[in-house]
């Protein structure tokens, strides 16, 4: 039985992934909360992979203090790298990092198309995206034959009970008839 450890035990992605993994009895899923420093005292050994979804998101990137920015770098970058170093030292084989599409910068203007491929260069437009880029760089330096690093860059994460921008968009979609002649089902 392979053991997987999810960091960010109470996060939307972490709890959703944990529920999804219940379909696979050959995997044992453990979770750990990263809010306090107690995770540093927990053993990662015996886990095949760590899915690192702990992090900060949903900031108003246009109006934050330097203190808030520092906290984002401490959590999204420094803690991710520290967690990966601990995992590698304790024999974990794979570290899966939840990054963000924010590493690519702003979306295309309305009416324009922007296609992102594996060759698209990162170009973060704000501190949140940059905190993820810096984490990715530090994590990839740890990758070797025995310790694989996987970077996931999802677009907006949404679903029942999700936070962030999705509930706002959902509310607008219900109240503003943007496409009144189209029945969206």
Task: Label each PLM-derived region with a short phrase.
Residues 123-150:
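Active-site Tyr-X1-5-Lys
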Residues 142-151, 155-185:
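NAD(P)-dependent short-chain dehydrogenase/reductase
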Residues 3-24:
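N-terminal Rossmann NAD(P)H-binding glycine-rich loop of SDR-like oxidoreductase domains
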Residues 7, 50-54, 95-101, 152-154:
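SDR active-site strand-loop-helix element
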Residues 37-90, 104-106:
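NAD(P)H-binding glycine-rich loop region in Rossmannoid oxidoreductase-like domains
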Residues 81-127, 150:
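Conserved Rossmann-fold NAD(P)-dependent oxidoreductase catalytic core, especially the SDR/UDP-sugar
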Residues 73-77, 114, 124-133, 156-159, ...:
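Short-chain dehydrogenase/reductase
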Residues 30-38:
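Rossmann-fold cofactor-recognition segment
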């Amino acid at each position: 039985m392979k053991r997987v450890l999810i960091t960010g035990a109470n996060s939307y992605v972490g709890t959703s992934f944990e529920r999804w993994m219940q379909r696979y009895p050959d995997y044992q899923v453990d979770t750990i909360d990263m809010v306090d420093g107690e995770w540093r005292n927990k053993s990662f050994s015996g886990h095949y992979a760590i899915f690192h979804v702990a992090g900060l998101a949903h900031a108003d990137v246009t109006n934050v203090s330097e203190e808030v920015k520092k906290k984002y770098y401490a959590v999204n970058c420094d803690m991710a790298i520290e967690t990966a170093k601990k995992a590698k030292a304790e024999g974990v084989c794979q570290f899966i990092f939840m990054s963000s599409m924010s590493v690519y910068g702003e979306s295309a203007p309305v009416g324009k198309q922007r296609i992102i491929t594996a060759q698209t260069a990162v170009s973060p437009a704000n501190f949140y995206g940059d905190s993820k880029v810096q984490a990715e760089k530090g994590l990839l330096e740890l990758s070797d034959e025995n310790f694989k690093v996987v970077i996931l860059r999802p677009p907006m994460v949404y679903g029942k009970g999700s936070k962030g921008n999705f509930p706002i968009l959902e509310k607008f979609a219900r109240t503003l008839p943007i496409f009144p002649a189209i029945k969206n089902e």
